[in-house]
């Protein structure tokens, strides 16, 4: 868990060793709970990436925060990801308050140490963290470069209770294929569009099927926005933006599935879907309890 844009998704991808979560420089890219499974010779660790803890605005923002908070109740260990570049006096005390009710060990993971020089600057932040909360461990890492991530993984494994594996060894996640297709498309939207457009987009995958002639995986998906102006921006002049989104998403999906992919994308307007419980449930965001 952690504030938006502190590198939680990059860290998940690094620890699992596969791309499990979409990554963007914009905050609040992750909207739902994402599970990644790390298989080791002597252990299986199930990681849960959550939306950033923030003051949720609007119905979708509220649900994202509830998803993150609910994840705290279902795990054996919590890693609070903080930016190593944060000044000690600017540490967010509110997030420590949210963690006081945690019934499991909490680690502070100080991410982005590759941006800190000299490393001695970390000492003040580590001291501030110790004074603010009873962390079981404080681990400086760089999810981007991988520095110290092996040590973090070892500390996580050591803290895990012994129980039978939850998943088969070939499993990397418990999410369906449609989820990963939608997330891949959404990542490209975040990277190739600006301002409010990526936040106003939802992706629904209507079909994934194998085709014989030519042999490929056929995927049909729709991107929903809230206004006609957003639709125009997403499509772009002569369809150029939508084509780039489709091409870059298809390339990632071909690597993911290991087969040629034909990706058909359409754009539709679903007005105010972020405040509509029916639409949120349709797009997989609404919690049922």
Where on the chain are the PLM-derived regions?
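Canonical P-loop GTPase G-domain recognition
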Residues: 104-107, 114-173, 177
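Catalytic P-loop NTPase motifs of RecA-like helicase/translocase cores
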Residues: 30, 54-55, 87-88, 116-117, ...
């Amino acid at each position: 868990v952690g504030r938006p844009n502190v590198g939680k998704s990059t860290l998940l991808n690094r620890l699992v060793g596969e791309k499990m979560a979409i990554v963007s420089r914009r905050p609040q890219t992750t909207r739902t709970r994402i599970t990644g499974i790390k298989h080791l010779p002597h252990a299986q660790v199930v990681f849960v990436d959550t939306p950033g803890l923030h003051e949720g605005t609007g119905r979708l923002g509220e649900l994202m925060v509830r998803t993150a908070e609910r994840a705290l109740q279902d795990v054996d260990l919590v890693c609070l990801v903080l930016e190593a570049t944060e000044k000690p006096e600017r540490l967010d005390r509110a997030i420590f308050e949210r963690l006081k009710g945690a019934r499991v060990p909490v680690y502070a993971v100080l991410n982005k140490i590759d941006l800190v020089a000299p490393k001695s600057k970390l000492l003040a932040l580590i001291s501030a963290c110790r004074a603010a909360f009873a962390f079981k461990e404080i681990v400086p890492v760089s999810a981007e470069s991988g520095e110290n991530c092996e040590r973090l993984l070892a500390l996580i494994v050591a803290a895990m209770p012994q129980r039978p594996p939850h998943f088969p060894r070939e499993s990397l996640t418990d999410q369906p294929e449609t989820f990963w297709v939608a997330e891949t498309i959404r990542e490209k939207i975040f990277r190739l569009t600006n301002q409010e457009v990526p936040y106003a987009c939802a992706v629904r995958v209507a079909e994934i099927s194998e085709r014989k002639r030519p042999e490929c995986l056929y995927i049909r998906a729709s991107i929903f926005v809230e206004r006609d102006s957003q639709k125009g921006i997403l499509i772009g002049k002569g369809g150029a933006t939508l084509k780039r989104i489709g091409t870059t998403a298809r390339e990632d999906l071909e690597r993911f599935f290991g087969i040629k992919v034909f990706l058909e994308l359409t754009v539709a307007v679903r007005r105010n879907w972020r405040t509509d419980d029916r639409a949120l449930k349709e797009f997989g965001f609404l919690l049922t309890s």
